[in-house]
A protein has these predicted regions:
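Sec-dependent N-terminal signal peptides of Gram-positive bacterial secreted proteins and lipoproteins
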Residues: 3-25
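Phosphate/dinucleotide-binding and metal-coordinating scaffold of catalytic cores
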Residues: 22-280
Length: 280
């Protein structure tokens, strides 16, 4: 009786689980016996969704980082033999008229608090420049208060995993924080890639003038925005070897014969890159 009950139980299990566990999916072909398994259908690339790496973002959106920037004349071969006054004097349009690259200076960037640089932070107890500094932006470069791009040299450290520090002043934006707010909101939107941002209180000591004061001048509040580059792709879990394009002109025209996928017969790389500059 027990044997009959056991056999009945086995038959019942085979029925419930579709005979999978009982080997009924085995098949023999050319003398080879295999057990067939169920496979998930391949995912169409059109159905793949972007997913940002949310763990990158600091949840304290009101925190302010204090930075100290000492600027000096650098090497002429690196376009850094200029004064701080010259760097802040010209707009992008001026540089285009002069047919020269944007002027730079050598910089020592240090991170700390309102009392000064802090031990363990970038640039602490250093005296040799660790970065280059130039203005950034296009139309905003005409403003009296400039935006700055600070590029930390290789092997000279980094800040929050970043070697390019973009400081935006937003002089023409009355509230001064809408750019930061927009990035904070983007963090919560699915399938939309964001960028790390932070408020920065910047102090600058100019050692390029004829009569340097030797003191740090308060430049006020800036928004630091993560540079979209190869490191960005890697840090956000994307393909760091992918092509990364930046629009040359921010506009909303479709250009259907030019802005197409690479496998489209109409794709012309030269025409495409008139609208988008390759950032790699």
């Amino acid at each position: 009786m027990n044997r009959k009950k056991s056999l009945a139980a086995v038959l019942l299990l085979c029925t419930v689980f579709g005979f999978t566990a009982c080997g009924t999916k085995e098949q023999t072909k050319n003398g080879v016996t295999t057990k067939k398994v169920d496979k998930q259908a391949a995912t169409d690339i059109s159905n793949v969704h972007l997913r940002d790496k949310k763990s990158l973002y600091d949840k304290d959106h009101t925190k302010v980082t204090t930075m100290y920037l000492t600027v000096r004349r650098g090497d002429a071969t690196e376009n850094q033999n200029h004064s701080w006054s010259e760097v802040n004097q010209y707009s992008v349009e001026d540089y285009q008229k002069m047919h020269v690259k944007r002027y730079q200076v050598a910089g020592l960037l240090q991170v700390g608090n309102e009392d000064g640089p802090v031990s363990g932070e970038l640039g602490y107890d250093q005296d040799v420049p660790n970065a280059s500094v130039q203005i950034r932006g296009e139309s905003s470069s005409k403003n009296a208060q400039k935006n700055y791009k600070i590029k930390i040299k290789k092997n000279k450290g980094e800040w929050n995993g970043q070697r390019t520090i973009n400081l935006n002043k937003h002089q023409t934006e009355a509230l001064r924080f809408r750019n930061k707010l927009s990035y904070d909101l983007m963090e919560e939107i699915p399938q939309l890639m964001g960028a790390r941002t932070s408020f920065v209180h910047l102090y600058v000591k100019d050692e390029t003038s004829d009569n340097p004061s030797g003191k740090f001048e308060d430049y006020g509040l800036y928004t630091q925005v993560e540079q979209i580059n190869k490191n960005y792709l890697k840090d956000h879990g994307l393909d760091e070897n992918a092509n990364l394009y930046k629009p040359n002109f921010f506009e909303f025209f479709r250009y259907e014969d030019t802005i197409v996928k690479e496998d489209d017969p109409k794709f012309d790389k030269d025409k495409f890159e008139k609208h988008f500059g390759n950032q790699r």
